[in-house]
Amino acid sequence: YFYEYGIDVDQDYEKAFELYSLGVDEGFPRSLFSTAYFLQNGYGVIQDLEEAFLRYEEAAALGHNDAICALGECYEYGQGTRQDYQRALHYYEKAAYEGNSLAKYKLGRFYDLGYGCNENYQKAFHWYQEAAKDGLEVAITAMATCYEFGRGIEKDSQKALEYYLKAANMGYMNAQFCLGYFYEMHSEYPESEKNSFYW
């Protein structure tokens, strides 16, 4: 962990992978998840998507919530396995109900876009809102968009602005872009031209 994030030592992915690997044979969920993540992204080791997927599966079977969400992403993008939106939805749903913030957002996105299910804007908004409560910037931005265009919730420009501002002030670049565009499209707000240029 310390080598992964460079806490009190120089950041060293190879050393971090080596140390995490010590717990893999013991079946430690955190070790399985961390080495899977390194293998997926090629951190300190040659990228191996298939092996990453297998380790995520093992960690998920042991109840590791982030691994359950990661399996959803593997199925969503076809990384280390075939692309399968319905399987992705299954894992996102499982992880979301266990409190995983990213899975809550992903579940909202799937309902929003109709991936592996029928489009359901109300459910999409619900899950965006749940992820936003956890402080996830992308979910806060998605909520703002729902309010701006009336997707799954009654249209409310003031609330859209409030949520765009919240996410933008957290440093989320997509929210900053959306906020600039929002001001450009809504000239009724004070100093909208100036604010549009700023964001």
Where is each model-derived feature located?
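Short, low-complexity interaction segments enriched in Ser/Thr/Pro/Gly
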Residues: 12, 27, 91, 101-103, ...
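Hydrophobic face of amphipathic alpha-helices that form TPR/SEL1-like repeat modules
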Residues: 1-5, 19, 32-41, 68-77, ...
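Ankyrin-repeat and related helical/solenoid repeat scaffolds used for protein-protein interactions
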Residues: 148, 158, 165, 170-198
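Residue-level recognition of tetratricopeptide repeat
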Residues: 28, 64-66, 100, 136-138, ...
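Short coil/turn and helix-start
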Residues: 5-11, 25, 43-47, 61, ...
